[in-house]
Amino acid sequence: SWPGYMPGVIDYQWNEVAIPWWKKFVQHAKQHGVEQIALEEFPSQLVYNPSTLLRLRNAVDDMIGMNLDPSHLIAMGADPIAAARKLEGAIFHVHGKDARIERGLADIDGLMEYQPVTNTKTRTWNYVAVGCGQDLKWWKEFFSVLRMTGYDGDVSLEMEDLTMSVEAGLRTSIDALNLSISR
């Protein structure tokens, strides 16, 4: 809430800009046969976590849901498994994407990272192949909780690990996802 004008700015963005715009957009989408709109939570956006997604959804329409990308929540220091539980019924899509908090760097500078993703050596967190940030036990629990909350949709692999070749990253991620997703 510092500086003092920030709460007013955020309230203005929600109440005078975002909610009215989304109400109109949802009506337009419905008129054109759209059934779901999935927003990906991402740092520095108005809708960046489960609480802000649910705020928008509750104010506008339940056709708005989350494209749950666990890597973004990990990079913000949140727990994607707890987030999945909170978002029960509001998860419309899931990304298979991992992130790693870089020990020794995040401990000093925190998680608000603005360096280019290409600076993997000095960033406090990095996108990594699935299983290279969170272990397979974590991924199995994540997918199990998704099932418990009713999610039975697709998982899109996003491989943005710049510490290995694309081929190695894809193979590592595919293997980890195959071992983690119960069929």
Explain the meaning of each model-derived region:
Residues 15, 50-54, 73-151, 167-168:
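Gly/Pro-rich active-site loop or hairpin
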Residues 28, 55-56, 145, 176-179:
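A generic secondary-structure signal
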Residues 7-11, 124-125, 159:
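A short, mixed-charge helix-start or loop-turn motif at secondary-structure junctions
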Residues 46, 55, 75, 163, ...:
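Conserved, well-structured beta-alpha core segment at the onset of a catalytic domain
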Residues 2-4, 40-44, 69-73, 97-101, ...:
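Active-site beta-loop-alpha junctions enriched in small/polar residues
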Residues 37-39, 64-68, 92-96, 153-157:
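Hydrophobic faces of well-ordered beta-strands that scaffold small-molecule active sites
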Residues 1-65:
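Active-site acidic/histidine proton-transfer and metal-coordination neighborhood
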Residues 166-183:
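C-terminal helical cap(s) of enzyme catalytic domains, especially alpha/beta-barrels
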